[in-house]
Design a protein with these regions (language model features):
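A structural signal for multi-pass alpha-helical bundles of membrane permease subunits
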Residues: 1-177
Length: 177
C-alpha cells in the first residue's frame, strides 16, 4: 500500500521535491557563478547595472511579484511544466553578490597563466576559476536546496501537476484536522 495525500503518492511528491530543489539550486548557482565571474573580472558597459539589478532583486518581495510572474509564465506556456525550473534561479541576488565578492578578490594572474598556456576564456573559467570557487558554490548550493525544499507557494501555484512534499504535507495536515 502506498502513502497517499489527496490522491497523490508521497514518494512521487518526494521525487518532485528532490528534482525541484536540486535542479533549481544547481541551475541558480551555476547561472550566478557565470554571471558573477564575468561581471567581476571583465570590464564592459553595463557592469554596474547588472550588479544593481542583483541588489534590486533582493529588495523586491517575492509575494508581491506573483501576479506578474503568473502572467508571464502563462504567456510563455510554461505553467505546470518542468520547464518552469529554468526560471527558478534560487536566490540569484544573494548567490551573485557572494560569488561576485569571491571572484573580485581572486587574483587575475591565474587567468593570465591560463591564457599564456593557450586556454580560452571558457577553459579558464571552467578549469581554473570555477574549481577555486567550489567551496563557496557548495555552500550556496546547500542554502538554495534548503530554500527550495521549504518553498510552498511557488510549486503550489505554478506546478500543480507536480506536487511537492510541502504541499502534500499541508494537504495531509488539512485532512487530519
Amino acid at each position: 500500500s502506498s502513502v497517499q495525500a489527496n490522491g497523490n503518492n508521497m514518494f512521487v511528491m518526494f521525487w518532485n521535491s528532490v528534482w525541484y530543489s536540486c535542479g533549481g539550486a544547481a541551475l541558480g548557482v551555476f547561472t550566478s557563478s557565470v554571471t558573477a565571474y564575468v561581471v567581476a573580472k571583465y570590464k564592459f558597459p553595463g557592469r554596474g547595472f547588472i550588479y544593481g539589478l542583483a541588489l534590486v532583486t533582493m529588495m523586491i518581495p517575492i509575494v508581491g511579484s506573483f501576479p506578474s510572474q503568473y502572467k508571464v509564465y502563462t504567456a510563455l506556456g510554461i505553467i505546470d511544466t518542468p520547464l518552469l525550473l529554468i526560471t527558478k534561479a534560487a536566490g540569484f541576488g544573494f548567490n551573485f553578490i557572494v560569488l561576485f565578492s569571491f571572484f573580485k578578490t581572486l587574483s587575475w594572474t591565474y587567468a593570465e597563466a591560463g591564457f599564456i598556456d593557450g586556454a580560452s576564456h571558457l577553459k579558464v573559467f571552467f578549469r581554473i576559476m570555477l574549481p577555486q570557487a567550489l567551496p563557496v558554490i557548495g555552500s550556496l548550493f546547500m542554502v538554495a536546496v534548503v530554500q527550495l525544499w521549504n518553498e510552498y507557494m511557488e510549486p503550489n501555484l505554478f506546478l500543480q501537476s507536480y506536487p511537492t512534499l510541502s504541499s502534500g504535507l499541508y494537504i495531509f495536515q488539512l485532512e487530519m484536522t
